[in-house]
Structure formats: C-alpha cells, structure tokens
Amino acid sequence: MTQLDRSVAPAIRQLEHFSILQPELYRMKNGMPLYVLSAGNEDVIRFDLLVRSGQLDQSQPPQAVFTNRMLREGTRSLSSSQIAEKLDYYGAWLDLSSSVNYGFVTLYSLGKYFPKTIEILASMIKEPIFPEKELSVVVDVNKQQFLVNAQRVDVMARKRLNRALFGLSHPLGRYAELEDYDRINSEVLKSFYHQYYHSGNCSVYVSGKVSPEVIHCIEQHFGESDWGDTTRKIKNETFVPTTEDCKRIFVEKEDALQSSIKIGTFSINQQ
C-alpha cells in the first residue's frame, strides 16, 4: 500500500463531462409554476410545495413555524390520526419546515401510490382547520423543547450573534420567548394561513421518476383553478438592521460544561 506524501498537494485537474440536469418548467392553468426534474429509475417521487412566507412575514413569533407545523393536525375531511395512518399505510413520509423566507411542505412517496398520497397532501394544504386540542399539545411539546434548547451554549451564542447583527427591532434579531408560545392560538395561525397559503403565492417542485400520471395528479389537485384567498395582498416589508458597535461579545453561563463560538458578518443579499 502506497504511503501518501501529505506534504505535497494533490494535482489540480479540470472536470470533464460535468453537467447538471435542469428542471422543466410547466405553468399550470391557475398560473402556479411546476418545476419537474425527472431522474432516476426507482419508483420514488419527491413533491415539494414552496410557500413564499416565513419568519420575516409573521406578525408575532413563532407564527410561521406553527402555521406550517399544524397542517398535518387535521383538515375538514381528515383528522390528524387519519392523516398519519394513511401516509404510513402507503409508505409515504412527510416533512414540514419553515425558514426565514419560505415555508416548505415535502412529501416522499412511491410512484404507484402517488395519486393517493397527493390527495391527502392536497387536503392538508387547502383545507386545514388548526384544531385547538391538537394545537395545545403541539405548543406544549415545543415549549419543552424551547426550555431545553435555551440552556444549550450553541443556541445562546447564535441568538446573541443575530441580535448583535440585526437588532431587536428586526425579525432576524428577535427570537421567540417562552411567553410567545402562550400567545399562539388557532385564529393567529388562520390569519397567517389565509394571507400566504394560496395558489398565487406557492410553487411546486417534483423530482424522481416523474411520469405523465404524476404531473396530471399535481395539476388536478393544485393547478386546475385558484385555491386559497388569492385576493390577499402580499406585504413586502423592508427591515433595516441596527448593528451593535461591539465586535466581541462574551456571554457567561454558570456551570456550563462546553463553550460555543459564533462568528458572523453581513454578506451578499439574497438575489
């Protein structure tokens, strides 16, 4: 076995035959964009619905996260247990997440069951009811997670860095506190949902072994006509950071067994 000479850098070579598969763009009847990336031989489909709303758009923390999270907790035609049982029966997996600018609904499904699983997903996205009982459970679970995470040094450092960069008046500088969870209720979530979850503010991305039947199912459930309150005006607010002058900040935590260092500055804006 040849011993590597780590004092000599490896040779630099030009990449050959490098290409990235580009998605095809379809414009559905209601104007929603559908991006299709057909690749792979396995009968698996990944479906992503992207909602142009996130932390920057919420009127109070953590409104955006809970609106997204509660989509799976009951609709006008399906209870939370029915949604979970049906997705499990078809071997599908669901992921709900929210970021600074966007909300994401991701479904992984076998292609042969996609007509069934997309029907469940359409009900979740187009007719959620945000039931108070399920919301209370979700809030309690997240409050416990908040209390645990609040003691982690890496979380403390990240929050303090963002507060120094953006300021408390900026959405990226203010994080949810424990009392913010008690202000979350169904009406707060419904307000955010009706404002942003509609066909005029969403786009669809589908990848995997995408057949014409898969595209037809997506168009049938999401592209035939407008859904949601498309008359709502999307607010495009601009927030100005108020950066602290201090370049080095030290936060002491008693009895901490670890330390965390965060370094950050402003870079290129989102394009």
What are these regions (language model features)?
Residues 1-8, 27, 82-233:
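Charge-rich, well-structured scaffold segments of protease-associated domains
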Residues 1-85, 190-271:
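His/Glu-rich zincin catalytic helix
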